[in-house]
């Protein structure tokens, strides 16, 4: 069972916390992580790219010139793919890029990423994270106390907290996420993850199933 330091919001170490082996100390499965992130990014695509075939391009209803006697190559329509402004052959069409991944595989990917973060000291645990009012200055001071200025930081919350969300949303590179919305891409796309002891317990409850 890995044991990591626990800090307060001023950056002082206030003790240690034991993390669950089956969530924060698993063998990192890079293949599964790649599979889940790729599927997630594919699902995020709009899939609206579209081109017109020769049957959809306007104009070109009649033969541009007679078949023989002009000295030019024979053509039957200006909508041919050979012409500038003609139809496109095998061009993109609107479609869904959704890739389905089993829930067990998604959870395995999340555990792998959290284990990687824990093993590489990219995970900071706070004894508590509460703000009475929404003020950006509070999060700026927190990041400064934890030596995280200028870094991409993901703050994981046990539940929705408007004060923390509003305090962090205007800071470049900082994102907040509740435990129920954890996903592989956001867990990977940062330099460090910050979460409270309460959030750790909530993560262990969700991912240990």
From Swiss-Prot:
Q: Which GO terms describe its molecular function?
A: rRNA binding; structural constituent of ribosome
Which Pfam families does the entry link to?
Ribosomal_L4 (PF00573)
Q: Name the segments for region: Disordered.
A: 46-76
Q: Which UniProt keywords apply?
A: Ribonucleoprotein, Ribosomal protein, RNA-binding, rRNA-binding
Does the entry feature the keyword Nucleus, yes or no?
no
The transmembrane residues are none
Query: Which function does this protein serve?
Result: One of the primary rRNA binding proteins, this protein initially binds near the 5'-end of the 23S rRNA. It is important during the early stages of 50S assembly. It makes multiple contacts with different domains of the 23S rRNA in the assembled 50S subunit and ribosome.
Protein name according to UniProt: Large ribosomal subunit protein uL4
Source species taxonomy: Bacteria, Bacillati, Bacillota, Clostridia, Halanaerobiales
């Amino acid at each position: 069972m890995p044991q990591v330091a626990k800090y307060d919001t001023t950056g002082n170490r206030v003790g240690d916390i034991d993390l669950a082996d089956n969530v924060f100390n698993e063998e990192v499965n890079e293949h599964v992580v790649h599979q889940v992130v790729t599927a997630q990014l594919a699902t995020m695509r709009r899939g609206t790219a579209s081109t017109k075939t020769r049957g959809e391009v306007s104009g070109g209803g009649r033969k541009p010139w007679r078949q023989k006697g002009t000295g030019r190559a024979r053509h039957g329509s200006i909508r041919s793919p050979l012409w500038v402004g003609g139809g496109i052959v095998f061009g993109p069409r609107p479609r869904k890029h959704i890739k389905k991944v089993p829930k067990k595989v998604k959870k395995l990917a999340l555990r792998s990423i959290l284990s990687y973060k824990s093993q590489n000291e990219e995970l900071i645990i706070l004894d508590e994270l509460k703000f009475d009012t929404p003020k950006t200055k509070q999060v700026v001071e927190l990041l400064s106390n934890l030596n995280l200025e200028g870094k991409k930081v993901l703050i994981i919350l046990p539940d929705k907290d408007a004060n923390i969300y509003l305090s962090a949303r205007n800071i470049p590179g900082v994102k907040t996420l509740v435990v129920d919305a954890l996903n592989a891409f956001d867990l990977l796309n940062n330099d460090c993850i910050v979460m409270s002891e309460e959030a750790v317990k909530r993560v262990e409850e969700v991912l240990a199933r």
